[in-house]
């Protein structure tokens, strides 16, 4: 099975893990600081806090911003954690529709802010598939209305926007180190920022809100959590980060092949990355034309049967039964249509061009046999 994404674990990772496992300290040690420093250097920020998941990172980012009982404006086209973490932090969530590239529509965001901005606690955007949002426009809106901006860059480590690394431009930015993401620490995440005060608050909450006066004496000054990432996981993260740019080049080779082969086909469109952006290529989404919406499940199953691991990114968050109970029925046209159209096909550094050609040939072969049928 050629999976839609895949971790890259080689002997250097195994060696790094083995060495870390032999250390006296397995958690709360020097490797945590080293990983945070490496992330800061790579992304181009001053401060970082690594945690046990991106969900934890989101939760503490929202909490540090003090968004309780306020509204978080976010995208529905994301993993549920983007909104869930805001609710856990005591906020309300409101979804803004997307554009045809899967990213939040900055014009619709502006229209919502013009309507009323006094109750907004944060704007939380997602760089879908590794393709940066229009950060200039969104950042300007956040500054104009004096609203904190969170960039959920879980897909986008290594991505760039106008020459700057994604993760260096918002008040707080989030990264994920789940195995399908650009680098992995098994599970893990991080918050990065140039705001020392916010990161200090997040680091305090990461470990129970406890500060140590002396080795044997501590004080709990906040109600915190156990969201720590182990030294063993950080050792893997440090080594993974060293390989990231090389792995992104390999992903780009696969996507360049797809872009060329899929141009002007009769079945689907692809997402074009603008010249002033660089994507991590976490995902390679294809967007079926409307006449194939009804056949998407058939296509999905046929591809799996052929050994091609596909996935759908994402069911809009407001479509989950929990959110229907919470918010009622919501219809956002672009997000609805994107969900009907989207399939993520294999694209990762473990593939070669032979694999990509197999995916392309199989995809077209199956689509040729699928009957068109408009289904709304």
From Swiss-Prot:
Substrate binds at residues 4, 24-27, 54, 176, 226, 311-314. Keywords: Aminotransferase, Pyridoxal phosphate, Transferase. It is an enzyme of class 2 (transferase). It catalyses: UDP-4-amino-4,6-dideoxy-N-acetyl-beta-L-altrosamine + 2-oxoglutarate = UDP-2-acetamido-2,6-dideoxy-beta-L-arabino-hex-4-ulose + L-glutamate. Its EC number is 2.6.1.92. It comes from the Bacteria. InterPro entries: DegT/StrS_aminotransferase, PseC, PyrdxlP-dep_Trfase, PyrdxlP-dep_Trfase_major, PyrdxlP-dep_Trfase_small. One of its GO terms (molecular function) is pyridoxal phosphate binding. Pfam families: DegT_DnrJ_EryC1. The modification N6-(pyridoxal phosphate)lysine is found at residue 181. The keyword Transferase applies. Catalyzes the second step in the biosynthesis of pseudaminic acid, a sialic-acid-like sugar that is used to modify flagellin. Uses UDP-2-acetamido-2,6-dideoxy-beta-L-arabino-4-hexulose as substrate producing UDP-4-amino-4,6-dideoxy-beta-L-AltNAc. Belongs to the DegT/DnrJ/EryC1 family. This is UDP-4-amino-4,6-dideoxy-N-acetyl-beta-L-altrosamine transaminase. It comes from Campylobacter jejuni subsp. jejuni serotype O:23/36 (strain 81-176). The gene is pseC.
